[in-house]
């Protein structure tokens, strides 16, 4: 009897060992089946389809006739127009109105407005790593004041990083453009050309792009008022003619696998956190208050920039979060500012007005 118990114990132990070994081996073999098949000339799996010409398993996708030429090839102009319409709609549905006091928004048709902040000229449309905004785009200035474009001067730039050397280069996201002209419905405003020229010249030095990424010891690189004045000493004189509203754009780039770390902000910016407004950004906002009785701030980022002070400032009339609107989203922003549509977006969570809360 004792011998039988010993036998069964031995067999049980052996079975348990073989079972465990089989499970481990099976997992390993399954994980490396492609390598094993290549070396042994075996085939672990085979896809069998019942698809036939008479009875297709899948229906072939056929684009709608409105985006096709007569010969059935794709009509690039129509396809781009569809992309413009989609980007426009996404921005309308995604923008969030965080503040609107004194019936500031919507602005009346034909309003004379001043755009302030270098990001009002070179807005962030996408990310340099992850989701990029590539090719032609419609700028905020165009969306507010124009109704057609050939994209001659609005091809998005992006920053390319060499991860071996750490070198960052700025380059066009599209090397060629066929020059097609596209029509759109702008807001019908008149935009201060003086400030557009100022920021155009300043960006020759700053080299901002429409796609950027956060970096250690971050500096949003908003030009100082001294730099603005050096570019055009009489820039403030333009406010009298374009003082119906002052629109300030505040931006922070966003990227896949990139975060703003606590305290990771460049020295000399006047900020202690990367999502806090810098001295130069605050100066731009104060300039907006001098330029107009109506001050509107556009939050051009996917991050929660610290806007508690702006929320509580009685001189800031409206705050509109526009995220990263993509190549054609500024058309939706323009629609909201002129009252053609009502902003219907909502935040997915509580907006933290303090970075370390």
What are these regions (language model features)?
Residues 1-357:
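C-terminal non-catalytic regions of proteins with extracellular/luminal or membrane-system context
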């Amino acid at each position: 009897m004792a011998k039988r118990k010993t036998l069964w114990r031995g067999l049980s132990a052996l079975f348990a060992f073989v079972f465990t070994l089989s499970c481990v081996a099976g997992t390993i073999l399954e994980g490396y089946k492609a390598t094993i098949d290549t070396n042994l000339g075996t085939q672990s799996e085979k896809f069998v389809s019942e698809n036939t010409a008479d009875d297709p398993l899948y229906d072939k996708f056929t684009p709608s006739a409105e985006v096709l030429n007569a010969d059935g090839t794709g009509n690039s102009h129509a396809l781009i127009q569809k992309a413009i319409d989609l980007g426009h709609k996404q921005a309308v549905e995604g923008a969030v109105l965080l503040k609107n006091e004194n019936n500031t928004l919507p602005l009346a048709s034909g309003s004379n407005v001043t755009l302030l902040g270098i990001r009002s000229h070179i807005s962030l449309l996408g990310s340099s790593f992850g989701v990029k905004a590539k090719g032609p785009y419609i700028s905020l200035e165009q969306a507010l004041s124009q109704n057609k474009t050939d994209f001659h001067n609005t091809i998005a730039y992006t920053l390319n990083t060499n991860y071996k050397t750490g070198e960052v280069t700025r380059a066009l996201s599209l090397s060629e453009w066929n020059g097609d002209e596209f029509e759109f419905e702008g807001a019908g405003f008149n935009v201060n050309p003086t400030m557009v020229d100022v920021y155009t010249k300043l960006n020759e030095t700053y080299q901002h792009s429409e796609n950027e990424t956060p970096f250690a010891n971050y500096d949003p690189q908003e030009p100082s008022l001294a730099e603005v004045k050096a570019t055009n000493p009489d820039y403030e004189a333009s406010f009298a003619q374009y003082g119906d509203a002052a629109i300030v754009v505040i931006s922070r780039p966003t990227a896949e696998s990139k975060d703003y770390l606590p305290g990771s902000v460049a020295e000399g910016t006047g900020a202690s956190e990367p999502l806090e407004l810098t001295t130069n950004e605050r100066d731009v906002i104060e300039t907006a208050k001098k330029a107009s009785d109506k001050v509107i701030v556009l939050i051009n980022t996917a991050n929660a920039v610290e806007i508690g002070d702006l929320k509580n400032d009685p001189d800031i009339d409206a705050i509109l979060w526009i995220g990263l609107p993509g190549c054609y989203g500024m058309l939706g922003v323009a629609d909201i500012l002129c009252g053609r549509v009502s902003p219907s977006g909502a935040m997915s969570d509580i907006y933290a007005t303090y970075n370390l809360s």
